[in-house]
A protein has these predicted regions:
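Small/flexible residues
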Residues: 4-6, 91, 104
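Generic beta-strand or strand-like secondary-structure segments
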Residues: 69-73, 89, 102-109
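Non-cysteine beta-strand/loop elements that form the S-adenosyl-L-methionine
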Residues: 14-19, 87-88, 116, 120-122
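Basic side chains
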Residues: 2-4, 81, 89, 113, ...
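Structural motif corresponding to the early beta-alpha repeats
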Residues: 77-98, 125
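N-terminal binding-site loop/beta-alpha segment at the start of enzyme catalytic domains
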Residues: 1-84
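Glycine/proline-rich, positively charged
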Residues: 94-131
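Active-site beta-loop-alpha junctions enriched in small/polar residues
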Residues: 21-23, 57-59, 89-93, 124-127
Length: 131
């Protein structure tokens, strides 16, 4: 798997990224549910595979369940594996608040669920919702 550098950040990622919204079990979006055991097994397999880049979001699943499940596996592994990058997204709250305070709170929520002190790559999720 080829590695690319993200702009001028120095962050290295594989050319492919594993999206993780489905492991948050979002049947309204995908038409099927994903059980917790299946989600954890999927993330364990991803951690051993050639794709070293995961994309998740504070908003995937109920109460950030996608991040929580990824965090469970990261904790089992003793942290983020060498050469692996976890990216997440900040999301507005249920009122649509996308203020600086909300962005900070979203980052802290993600750090807690993912068991990561530092998030190397964070996106704004669907910022058109506030325009």
């Amino acid at each position: 798997m080829r590695i690319r550098t993200v702009g001028k950040t120095g962050l290295q990622v594989t050319e492919l990224c594993v999206g993780t919204s489905a492991i948050g079990s979002m049947p309204g979006t995908y038409g099927y549910s994903v059980g917790e055991d299946q989600a954890l097994d999927t993330q364990r397999l991803v951690s051993r595979g050639p794709i070293r880049f995961i994309d998740t979001s504070n908003e995937y699943g109920v109460d950030g369940s996608s991040e929580r499940l990824i965090g469970t596996v990261l904790r089992e592994l003793g942290g983020v594996p060498e050469g692996f990058l976890v990216a997440t997204k900040v999301d507005p709250d249920s009122t649509g608040d996308f203020s600086g305070r909300r962005v900070h709170a979203s980052v802290v929520e993600s750090q807690t669920r993912l068991h990561m002190d530092r998030l190397p790559l964070v996106y704004l999720h669907d910022p058109e919702r506030i325009s």
